[in-house]
């Protein structure tokens, strides 16, 4: 395979951190494959952005490279067989948790607000309460109640009393401050990564 001077420079680099900026079709993955080939005694974790990229990576990388999506990594290390996972929470899930509010005329709106805010919480790279502008309310009491409700949802999920969403277990995995024991971590299509994904890998 004929490599460009730029690719050769990257492959031979001894820098601790390397960022590759290139357009579509610029052989970024090929560069990463060659990077691993010249380091057969090193261990690599290759993070693919989605399932199709992961499947392609599994075909191209050698045995010293573990290929995972970020969610796949979190699932295997945090979820395993301990938790039930769903694509999204339903109204019945919230109705069981917040039974005292279930007779409210605007319960559907209550569920929508908690669900939306919980999804936002799952995308933030920290464990701080949501701010008023994020909840879209200037009512301090309402903001506090929403944050309390999010805390209830989190605790129920951790205890296994409520199924986890995919973004939830990724967030919970991040909060464990995982240490990934690989010589190199390769993050393909990093520009599309969520703040939670970036927090996991930037903290290594």
Task: Give, region by region, the residue ranges found by the protein language model.
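Short, charged low-complexity intrinsically disordered segments located at boundaries
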Residues: 42, 85-89, 181-182
